[in-house]
A protein has these predicted regions:
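Conserved short alpha-helical segments that host acidic/polar catalytic motifs at enzyme active sites
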Residues: 1-173, 178-180, 184-198
């Protein structure tokens, strides 16, 4: 299954006010992203979500927040042969997931989460799952909503209001929520160091 994308710079209302754009996209699941650039330049190649075709299937990731150890991770990845196409810290997440030796996507993601530090929330779409991740300290928000029986993940409840979805709950600190078809399941990222260093 292929991912289809519409990515534009600017305000959501300016770019997606024509319902024809969204109605032409096939499929029943989607992720969207609105972010002012805090890491990396405001250039078209830095627009999210980011997409990758991994050995285990398609992977799309939208990231809100900042990773604090990007320099050291990126240096290590480049020295081992990785090529970066953007200046966004989100691309580091894709690189780490792609290079993980784990077999399952959730295990690849957990392997990646052990390596990154910072304040973040992630929304990930694969061919079979919608996944939400909140950093171990819960600094960046992520909420679960429901729209007519379909799960929705958003960084703020106002996004739920805009699409007519009902707020269900906040995603917990360090939680990974994976949504498979119509079932919702949860696992926590146990073992991620949540101690603060000065």
């Amino acid at each position: 299954k292929a991912f289809h994308s519409v990515r534009k710079q600017g305000l959501v209302g300016d770019n997606f006010n024509n319902k024809d754009i969204l109605s032409k996209l096939p499929g029943k699941t989607a992720i969207g992203h609105v972010r002012y650039s805090t890491t990396g330049e405001s250039k078209p190649e830095n627009l999210q979500p980011f997409f990758a075709n991994l050995a285990i299937g398609g992977f799309a990731c939208a990231h809100n927040g900042n990773l604090t150890n990007t320099y050291s991770i990126k240096k290590r990845l480049v020295e081992s042969g990785s090529i970066f196409q953007t200046s966004s810290d989100t691309e580091i997440i894709l690189q780490l997931v792609a290079r993980s030796k784990k077999k399952k996507i959730i295990d690849k993601l957990i392997d990646t989460l052990y390596q990154i530090k910072g304040a973040y929330s992630l929304v990930i779409l694969t061919n079979k799952k919608l996944i939400g991740v909140r950093d171990p300290f819960g600094i960046r928000p992520l909420v679960l909503g429901d729209k007519s029986g379909s799960p929705v993940l958003a960084s703020e409840t106002c996004a739920l209001d805009m699409i007519g979805a009902k707020y269900v709950r906040d995603i917990e600190n360090g939680e990974i929520i994976h949504i498979v078809l119509i079932s919702w399941s949860k696992s926590n990222c146990l073992g991620i160091n949540t101690s603060r260093t000065s």
